[in-house]
Design a protein with these regions (language model features):
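Oligomerization/assembly interface segments of phage tail-like spikes and tubes
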Residues: 30-51, 265-283
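N-terminal ordered "arm"
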Residues: 1-48
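A general structural signal for short secondary-structure junctions and capping/turn motifs
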Residues: 4, 31-36, 60-63, 141, ...
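Small/polar beta-strand repeat architecture
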Residues: 3-12, 81-121, 126-172, 183-188, ...
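Glycine-rich, often proline-containing surface loops adjacent to acidic residues and nearby aromatics
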Residues: 37-42, 170-178
Length: 283
């Protein structure tokens, strides 16, 4: 995509697919969230002469309507506000148990095995298999009491000795990530409103699998050679983020395609061109 000129107007949206049913008798509403969550954008370029317009015309035409994809980002948030000092972080599965007995009380989770031995304060864990549905989902760790006990920001329904639960990190559906700084020297903040580019490999140049926004200032823990980061995100993680795969901090982008198969532009009497287009994140 051409780098200049920058857009003069942008409408940036997050679209969720949520089913809603309202009882005609009680008025109570039930909702169900589905996997279809994606960003959309409508953008307009400033008036430009033909020498610049042809770059954008060529780019848009080569997209072949909705067929081809391109990297794109929120035009008004191209640079993150956090001070994290290198280009990316890596995924680290500090908690990854596929079958463990769990008990829930207050804000505490107790495991029947050493599930939390590598967990850090600020990590986000995803629980599945609990009997009480409110106990499942993403939970943020505030205290690692021991290898079997953690305290979280959630309030649980009391439940004891439920077998075959899963406690994992960086899995599909997570609304928080457990990340590791890319080098011993990497440090700094990741701030609310920053974006991260989720990769399906250990590189920064491949096709992004998802673009997410940080929804609270990240928790950074210095413990050993590399800093650990717990990062709350929206939308939820679309697919598992494997160990070592990258979350790109510098110039993060998502993968987008045009919404329409039609490409058009306008020109005035002195040959100033006007170009606008709409795009949608690829799921």
């Amino acid at each position: 995509m051409p780098s200049t000129p920058n857009f003069v107007r942008s409408n940036w949206s997050l679209v969720r697919t949520v089913g809603t049913t309202t009882s005609p008798f009680t008025g109570k509403t039930k909702t169900q969230e589905f996997d279809g969550v994606y960003w959309t954008a409508e953008v307009s370029l400033p008036p430009m002469r033909r020498s610049q317009a042809v770059e954008w015309q060529s780019f848009l035409l080569e997209l072949n309507g909705t067929v081809n994809h391109f990297k794109f980002a929120d035009p008004d948030a191209l640079t993150n506000t956090g001070t994290y000092s290198t280009g990316h972080l890596t995924s680290e599965l500090r908690t990854n148990s596929s079958s463990v007995t769990l008990s829930f009380s207050g804000s505490t989770i107790t495991a029947g095995a050493s599930t939390f031995g590598s967990a850090k304060v600020g990590d986000f864990i995803v629980v599945t298999g609990a009997t009480n549905e409110d106990n499942n989902g993403t939970h943020k760790i505030t205290t690692v009491t021991s290898a079997t006990v953690v305290v979280t920001t959630s309030t649980f329904t009391t439940e004891s000795n439920t077998a075959s639960c899963k406690v994992r990190t960086n899995v599909k559906g997570a609304t928080g990530l457990s990340l590791l700084a890319s080098t011993n020297a990497a440090s700094g903040t990741i701030k609310k409103g920053d974006y991260l580019q989720i990769q399906s490999a250990a590189n920064t140049t491949g096709t992004p699998t998802q673009l997410v926004m940080v929804t609270e200032d990240a928790t950074a823990t210095a413990d050993g050679a590399k800093d650990f980061y717990g990062v709350a995100i929206q939308p939820k993680l679309r697919s598992d983020l494997a160990t070592g795969h990258y979350a790109v901090f510098t110039n993060p982008k998502g993968t987008f395609r045009l919404i329409s198969n039609e490409v058009s532009w306008s020109a005035d009497r002195i040959s100033n061109y006007g170009i606008s287009f709409s795009c949608i994140e690829v799921i």
